[in-house]
């Protein structure tokens, strides 16, 4: 079974909302260098506690603010085929996130957006 392993919060001004999440939830932020977009890693708690960490970034052109969950998959290519066969749509094609893996974004048949991540520390 594939699980949600990451979330992303999209906002027009990522720097301005960081204090909110820090003060309300105690989350910490670290800017991620080397990716395709300006991105902050969000740590929501100790790795020994249940839960997931995420990211904070600006929406892509035409995308609204909001939250997207990312699901870990063993093969991004196979999963993208299954999505299209099942009536879903690939919105952002496969791209490398250096030293982390391969990422794509898709919609289910109802239009709900989600991310897919195939871990691969050799991704470039």
Segments predicted by a language model, with ranges:
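N-terminal beta-strand motif that seeds the catalytic metal site of vicinal oxygen chelate
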Residues: 1-18, 66-71, 119-124
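Structural motif
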Residues: 4, 51-54, 66-68, 101
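Acetyl-CoA-dependent GNAT
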Residues: 56-59, 119-120
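Conserved beta-strand in the GNAT
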Residues: 54-56, 114-115
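Short beta-strand element of the conserved SAM-dependent methyltransferase core
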Residues: 40-44, 56, 71, 106
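Mid-chain, well-packed structural core segment of small domains
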Residues: 63-88
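Vicinal oxygen chelate
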Residues: 9, 30-33, 80-81, 85-124
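Core segments of cupin and vicinal oxygen chelate
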Residues: 1, 8-51
């Amino acid at each position: 079974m594939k699980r949600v392993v990451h979330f992303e919060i999209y906002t027009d001004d990522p720097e301005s909302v960081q204090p909110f999440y820090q003060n309300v939830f105690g989350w910490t932020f670290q800017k991620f260098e080397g990716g395709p977009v300006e991105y902050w890693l969000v740590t929501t708690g100790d790795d020994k506690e249940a839960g997931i960490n995420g990211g904070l970034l600006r929406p892509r052109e035409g995308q609204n603010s909001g939250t997207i969950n990312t699901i870990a998959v063993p093969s991004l290519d196979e999963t993208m085929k299954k999505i299209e066969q099942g009536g879903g749509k690939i919105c952002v094609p496969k791209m490398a996130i250096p030293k982390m893996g391969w990422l794509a974004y898709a919609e289910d048949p109802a239009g709900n957006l989600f991310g897919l991540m195939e871990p691969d520390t050799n991704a470039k």
